[in-house]
Swiss-Prot record:
Disulfide bonds join C37-C64, C48-C66. It comes from the Eukaryota. Has antibacterial activity. One of its GO terms (biological process) is innate immune response. Residues 1-24 form the signal peptide. This is Beta-defensin 135. The keyword DNA repair does not apply. It is found in: Secreted. One of its GO terms (cellular component) is extracellular region. Belongs to the beta-defensin family. It holds the Pfam family Defensin_beta_2. Keywords: Antibiotic, Antimicrobial, Defensin, Disulfide bond, Secreted, Signal. It comes from Pan troglodytes.
């Protein structure tokens, strides 16, 4: 009886973790949120574009915070 329950649990877990090959991965909107930073105005990429500045460093090997300067707050003081 116990082995039957364990086998059933393994089958159910296997089916829960199965991802169909045609449409695997997170949806486009979720990818956009997780690949962005600075209140969704910046992006994480290996190098910033010419008109962007680095606001902070994030994930290793990626610069997280490539933001257009018009979205950055005005700095006060030195």
């Amino acid at each position: 009886m116990a082995t039957r329950s364990v086998l059933l649990a393994l089958v159910v877990l296997n089916l829960l973790f199965y991802v169909p090959p045609g449409r695997s991965g997170p949806n486009v909107y979720i990818q956009k949120i997780f690949a962005s930073c600075w209140r969704l105005q910046g992006t994480c990429r290996p190098k910033c574009l010419k008109n962007e500045t680095i606001s902070y460093f994030g994930v290793i090997l990626y610069i997280c915070g490539c933001v257009n300067p018009k979205y950055l707050p005005i700095l006060t003081g030195k």
